[in-house]
Structure formats: C-alpha cells, structure tokens
C-alpha cells in the first residue's frame, strides 16, 4: 500500500512479514491489521535503545530483565511501524511498552501515545520467546 505495507491482492485479510538471519515470520489475520517482528534473543539493542526506548519505562524494569525488555521494545516498535506506518513522531516519545514479566510467551501492554489519529484503537501484543528467537505480533482490535 502507500505506506509500504504488504497487501493481499484480490484476497481478504491482512499480512505482515519479518525476517532475521535464516528465519522468516509471516502473520495473517482475516479481520484485523497486524504487524510482526522477530529478532535473535542474543541481539544487543542497548546501543540503539536511546533512540526508541522511553526512559521512564526502562527505569521501572529490574536490571535482570532489561535486556529482554529492550529487545521486546525494539520488536514492538518495528511491529507497530509495520502495522500503522509512520506514527508522526518518535518512537521514544510516543510508543509505550509497559514493563512485563518475561517468559516463554505472553502478552505485553503496548500503546501509541495518541499521535496517530487514524489509529485510535486498542492494540494487543503477544510474544513468544523460544530461547533463540523473540517474536512479537501486534494486532489492531
């Protein structure tokens, strides 16, 4: 489409695609727009964190959980971009990833800080961490 997102030509539904070193991830939803991202669990995103991570959220995360929180936040920003397109501001100031208890799978509270009037909807973020890959799906509800 005009925002660079993949579309299903002549078909019903929404798709999103991600890839990283030897892996690919495809999400399909019949009814709701989706965005996905995946990264290797051992990827160090701390150097880039200052560009995409809200400092107040990071400070609320225990030190032992910060690496996975930073990776989840990175994946959430990437997935949101694939879902929404240009949010009209910076991720650091406008994407909120609330601290969460990490495990092998679960949900994460993700929100866009009111700057995308065309995307004033509920977002649901689900993740899987298989020990090698961290995969995150954001769906508009």
What are these regions (language model features)?
Residues 1-141:
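Core catalytic alpha/beta fold that binds nucleotide/phospho-ligands
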């Amino acid at each position: 489409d005009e925002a660079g997102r993949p579309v299903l030509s002549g078909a019903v539904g929404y798709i999103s695609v991600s890839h990283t070193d030897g892996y690919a991830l495809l999400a399909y939803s019949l009814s709701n727009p989706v965005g996905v991202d995946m990264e290797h669990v051992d990827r160090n995103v701390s150097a880039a964190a200052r560009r995409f991570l809200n400092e107040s959220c990071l400070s609320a995360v225990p030190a032992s959980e910060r690496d996975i929180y930073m990776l989840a936040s990175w994946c959430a920003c990437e997935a949101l971009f694939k879902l929404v397109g240009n949010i009209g501001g910076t991720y650091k100031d406008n994407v909120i990833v609330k601290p969460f208890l990490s495990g092998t799978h679960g949900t994460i509270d993700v929100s866009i800080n009111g700057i995308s009037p065309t995307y004033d909807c509920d977002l649901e973020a689900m993740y899987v961490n298989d020990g090698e890959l961290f995969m995150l799906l954001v769906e508009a509800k």
